[in-house]
């Protein structure tokens, strides 16, 4: 889906890693939540509270998912799932546009 209708957008940005990763929170009438953001090239580690679906809209990165022994390459148009209460690592190779859906 390239467009969301009838949503609430939180005006203040979520800013991480000194601006290397930024996003805006979108809340749907149903109560479900997503963030739309941009990641600059760099190495990042995130911790989840809820399970997440990370959709990479453009760009490319490598992800090390919880329990994995090797990095997985993800490009624009691909996605990956992250379990709740877990940590995952990213090596962002180019400016990356993403949509994160919170699944819990």
Swiss-Prot record:
CDD domains: cupin_PpnP-like. It catalyses: a purine D-ribonucleoside + phosphate = a purine nucleobase + alpha-D-ribose 1-phosphate; adenosine + phosphate = alpha-D-ribose 1-phosphate + adenine; cytidine + phosphate = cytosine + alpha-D-ribose 1-phosphate; guanosine + phosphate = alpha-D-ribose 1-phosphate + guanine. GO terms for cellular component: cytosol. It comes from the Bacteria. InterPro entries: Ppnp, RmlC-like_jellyroll, RmlC_Cupin_sf. Its EC number is 2.4.2.1, 2.4.2.2. Keywords: Glycosyltransferase, Transferase. Coiled coil: none annotated. It holds the Pfam family Ppnp. One of its GO terms (molecular function) is thymidine phosphorylase activity. Belongs to the nucleoside phosphorylase PpnP family. Catalyzes the phosphorolysis of diverse nucleosides, yielding D-ribose 1-phosphate and the respective free bases. Can use uridine, adenosine, guanosine, cytidine, thymidine, inosine and xanthosine as substrates. Also catalyzes the reverse reactions. PANTHER family: PYRIMIDINE/PURINE NUCLEOSIDE PHOSPHORYLASE (PTHR36540), PYRIMIDINE_PURINE NUCLEOSIDE PHOSPHORYLASE (PTHR36540:SF1). HAMAP family: Nucleos_phosphorylase_PpnP. This is Pyrimidine/purine nucleoside phosphorylase.
């Amino acid at each position: 889906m390239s467009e969301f209708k009838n949503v609430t957008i939180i005006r203040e940005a979520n800013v991480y890693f000194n601006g290397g990763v930024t996003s805006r929170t979108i809340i749907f009438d149903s109560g479900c939540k997503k963030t739309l953001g941009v990641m600059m090239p760099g190495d990042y580690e995130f911790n989840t509270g809820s399970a997440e679906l990370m959709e990479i809209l453009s760009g490319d990165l490598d992800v090390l998912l919880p329990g994995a022994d090797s990095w997985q390459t993800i490009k624009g148009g691909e996605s990956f799932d992250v379990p709740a209460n877990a940590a995952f690592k990213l090596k962002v190779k180019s400016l990356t546009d993403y949509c994160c859906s919170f699944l819990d």
